[in-house]
């Protein structure tokens, strides 16, 4: 129904709680992963690598970290499908339909983007077990105006109103969320592309950016990483923050 303009978007929200469907994303992920022999988190574990995805459980009002919290949804961690987890983690409220999943007790969980509760969960990789000599480094966009588009003005329709709410919330979280030590180990990338009057801030929910805009963001990231590596002082970071990290928890 999202193909029928504002009315279609409003109807999609009314009947499915989201403007766009994410089933295509799950199918695309399956097509990308299956040739590599990866279907579940267990398959990833066998490669010696780890993957964590965060999901907001609106039913229980809590953050889930998959695959560890898979039992909350009635499945074993090693058997949880990666493509399904990606779909859940990508379902930004209002923009995309939530994923519904019934657990072993018959309770239906409404699951959306983990960024609703923790938009920068770099702490997930600080599990307190591996004790790597260096911390996990993160990349995040920060800077510019809170949104790359005009805000909600006049008398917007229901869909545009709710989209503006979610875009603003997500962008503000992007700019403000950081726990002890996270800021110092984060490579902050400017989301501003172009110069002068042509400058534009790419927001978290700008899904239709061009290839040129994508390349500009990539170039911003490369420059930010080079600057970070020139000034990074691990000894100083460890002295100031290592003992303050609450490994794998918030």
Where are these regions (language model features)?
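Patatin-like phospholipase
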Residues: 1-250
